[in-house]
């Protein structure tokens, strides 16, 4: 079994093995799967980090570099007649905590017949497609969480808009 414990800080121009994973699989820190070669793989990554992205590289215990590829999935591709309608669609999907990929004039989400009906009711054009899915990360660190009575406020640093900071 190819055992992987570490993400590499940068994408590597060369790799020894490939993992083709769905978004759900790329979201897991613990996973048993198979490499493109058919070799069994065990992922034991640090918890609490963003999902693996297409092109990310990992280092196996034996020193091999493994590149991650986003596998094509059944998605809904959403477009609208106006930016206002697209914003409204994004608002309603966000209100339901739906993982959402945002592009120039379009949204993509995992195929779901209930959400498809809702979007069509809002006037959106919704088409089923097969494509890799790379949704937005949350705007704040620490994952998804709601404060509850008696808990301290969460003070996550923003990840989207750090004005004056260049990366």
UniProtKB/Swiss-Prot annotation:
InterPro entries: UreE, UreE_C_dom, UreE_N, UreE_N_sf
GO cellular component, one term: cytoplasm
Superkingdom of origin: Bacteria
Disulfide feature: none
Intracellular or extracellular location(s): Cytoplasm
Function: Involved in urease metallocenter assembly. Binds nickel. Probably functions as a nickel donor during metallocenter assembly.
Name under which the protein is recorded: Urease accessory protein UreE
Upper lineage: Bacteria, Pseudomonadati, Pseudomonadota, Gammaproteobacteria, Pseudomonadales
Gene behind this protein: ureE
């Amino acid at each position: 079994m190819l055992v992987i414990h570490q993400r590499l800080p940068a994408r590597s121009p060369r790799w020894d093995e490939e993992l083709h994973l769905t978004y759900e699989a790329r979201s897991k820190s613990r996973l048993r799967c198979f490499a493109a070669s058919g070799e069994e793989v065990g992922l034991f990554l640090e918890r609490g980090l963003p999902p693996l992205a297409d092109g990310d590289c990992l280092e196996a215990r034996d020193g091999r570099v493994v590149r991650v590829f986003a596998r094509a999935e059944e998605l809904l591709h959403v477009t609208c007649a106006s930016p206002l309608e697209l914003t409204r669609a994004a608002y309603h999907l966000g209100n339901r905590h739906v993982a959402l990929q945002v592009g120039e004039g379009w949204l993509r989400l995992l195929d779901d017949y209930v959400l498809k009906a809702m979007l069509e009711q809002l006037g959106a054009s919704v088409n089923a497609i097969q494509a890799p899915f790379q949704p937005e990360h949350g705007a704040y660190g620490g994952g998804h969480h709601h404060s509850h009575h008696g808990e301290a406020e969460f003070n996550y640093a923003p990840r989207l808009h750090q004005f004056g900071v260049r990366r």
